[in-house]
Regions:
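Glycine-rich dinucleotide-binding loop and its adjacent helix/turn
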Residues: 1-39, 46-53
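Short glycine-rich anion-binding loops that position phosphate/pyrophosphate groups of nucleotides
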Residues: 44, 137-139, 235
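C-terminal, flexible cofactor-proximal segment of oxidoreductases
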Residues: 196, 200-294
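Alpha-helical membrane-anchoring segments
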Residues: 282-328
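FAD-site-proximal beta/loop scaffold in flavoenzymes
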Residues: 1-21, 112, 125-199
């Protein structure tokens, strides 16, 4: 899907470069990203960061490109604290993304999208070249079929009890993105993210073993998440990490650093150390367009950070020489 989307984006820029009608050119270069959750804002950030490069390559005026991020909710990434959501919104606006929050998509088709603000009854018809749907996660096909029989919520997520069993069929266990479970004392269901998948899988495996062998005892699912991280392009991110009862926000540099640490941690488990070296080379040493939270300073094509000790030494020598000249 990512490759198809990338080729589509290049294709609309190629068409726009040849288009002589300004109105049609701007339609081709209009992007609507529906959904301002984790996927939506990350997509908007990546696209906004990629647009200047595409404009240079295809000789397109940046002013003709429009990126809209649409969501029915009042703020971006509502799973984050409001302070971090505000940072995300500020960064997206700085990158040229137009936020359309509290806005519902009522209809869309080839070359257009119709949106309606919750504060107004008027429906706005906008021309567009691309609509990217990032408004929520759909359950897998097999889960969707199961949801026709089993109690479910939110796009086919199956309701489960404390032991991750279906509410009506105790021999059916559901985990990860496919389950709908609200922990005790919480008001919202567990998020559809990696930590929830891993932790629920471990609990379900033990409970299935108990159901088969009838030895030991069932384990209640008590999720303990260590935080979330959102990257807005390759140079900026926000994160909230810590322990369940002690969470804190990280500044952008540390947030991006934690992102790479997490990626490396999972690569070691899945692909081994060889992949780590490839990842480090790609993300820190071969950096194109300064697309990294360390800028281009670590690039092997321009390793300017290696010059820092030399510059410090040279500055110290000049200071020492000037001091001697002053004394003489």
């Amino acid at each position: 899907d990512a490759v198809i989307l990338r080729e589509h984006i290049h294709d609309v820029f190629r068409k726009a470069a040849r288009e002589t009608n300004l109105e049609e050119k701007r339609r081709l270069l209009t992007f609507h990203i529906v959904g301002a959750g984790f996927t939506g804002v990350e997509m908007a950030g990546e696209l906004a960061e990629y647009v200047p490069i595409l404009c240079d390559r295809y000789e397109v005026d940046r002013k003709d490109v429009s990126i809209y991020n649409v969501d029915i909710l009042e703020r971006t990434v509502p799973f984050l604290p409001e302070k971090l959501s505000n940072k995300v919104e500020k960064r997206l606006k700085k990158m040229g993304v137009t936020l359309m929050l509290s806005t519902n998509v009522s209809k869309m088709g080839k070359g257009f999208i119709e949106i309606q603000s919750k504060d107004e009854d008027k429906t706005v018809h906008q021309k567009t070249g691309t609509v990217i749907w990032a408004a929520g996660i759909e359950s897998s096909n097999i889960t969707q079929k199961a949801a026709e029989i089993l109690p479910s919520e939110n796009r086919g997520r199956i309701k489960v009890d404390d032991y991750l069993r279906s509410l009506e069929h105790k021999d059916v266990f559901v985990i990860g993105d496919n389950m709908y479970y609200i922990p005790e004392g919480e008001k919202t269901p567990v998020p559809q993210m990696v930590e929830n998948c891993e932790q629920s899988a471990a609990v379900a495996a033990k409970n299935i073993a108990y159901a088969i062998t009838n030895s030991g005892e069932m384990i209640k699912y008590k999720p303990s998440f260590h935080g979330v991280m959102v990257s807005i392009g390759g140079r900026y991110g926000v994160a909230r990490v810590g322990l369940p009862n002690l969470m804190f926000n990280l500044p952008s540099f540390l947030a991006m650093l934690s992102k790479h640490f997490i990626n490396i941690f999972y690569f070691v488990q899945v692909l081994g150390w060889n992949k780590i070296f490839s990842y480090v080379k790609h993300e820190f040493l071969t950096i194109r367009n300064c697309r990294s939270f360390v800028g281009g300073h670590f690039s092997n094509r321009n390793p300017s950070f290696l010059l820092v000790p030399l510059r410090i030494w040279l500055g110290a020598v000049w200071t020492y020489v000037n001091t001697l000249d002053t004394k003489s």
